[in-house]
């Protein structure tokens, strides 16, 4: 089965934008529901909204890269680095802190997107 070369950017871009919206869009509402902790300080709200901005910015770049051939390689490389880095962090957390029921599915998806992007970089040099 051959997957389209650009689909990984489109899918991961949409997922990361949605994750960013969960982190930063009304963190005082979403964080207790999703992650079981309260956001009670201005600093924590600011940090979560900054994370939202990073996620939304990189997600938009990946979506642009999925449509614009000129940006495909840079977007795919940034996707591989992001997914590889976040996977590495979650693996370290799993080893030191234990298995997270909430984030294990995210870890699996991040590893899959990392491998898919790496594969695309290796075998699609003509883009």
Predicted regions and their residues:
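Juxtamembrane helix-break-helix junctions at the cytosolic face
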Residues: 60-74
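Membrane-water interface at the C-terminal end of transmembrane alpha helices
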Residues: 112-127
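Membrane-helix boundary connector in multi-pass membrane proteins
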Residues: 80, 88-104, 122-123
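Non-cytosolic membrane-interface motifs at loop->transmembrane helix junctions
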Residues: 38-39, 99-109
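Hydrophobic transmembrane helix segments
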Residues: 15-46, 52
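Cytosolic juxtamembrane helix and N-cap/initiation of the first transmembrane helix
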Residues: 1-16
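Core segments of alpha-helical transmembrane spans in multipass integral membrane proteins
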Residues: 43-64, 81-85
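Alpha-helical transmembrane segments of multipass membrane proteins
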Residues: 20-21, 62-63, 88-92, 115
């Amino acid at each position: 089965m051959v997957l389209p070369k650009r689909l990984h950017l489109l899918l991961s871009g949409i997922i990361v934008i949605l994750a960013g919206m969960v982190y930063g869009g009304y963190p005082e509402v979403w964080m207790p529901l999703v992650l079981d902790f309260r956001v009670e300080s201005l600093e924590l709200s600011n940090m979560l909204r900054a994370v939202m901005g990073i996620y939304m910015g990189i997600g938009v770049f990946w979506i642009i890269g999925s449509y614009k051939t000129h940006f495909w390689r840079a977007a795919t490389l940034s996707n591989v680095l992001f997914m590889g880095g976040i996977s590495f962090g979650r693996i370290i957390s799993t080893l030191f802190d234990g298995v997270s029921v909430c984030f294990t599915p995210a870890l699996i998806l991040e590893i899959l997107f990392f491998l898919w992007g790496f594969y695309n970089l290796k075998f699609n040099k003509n883009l």
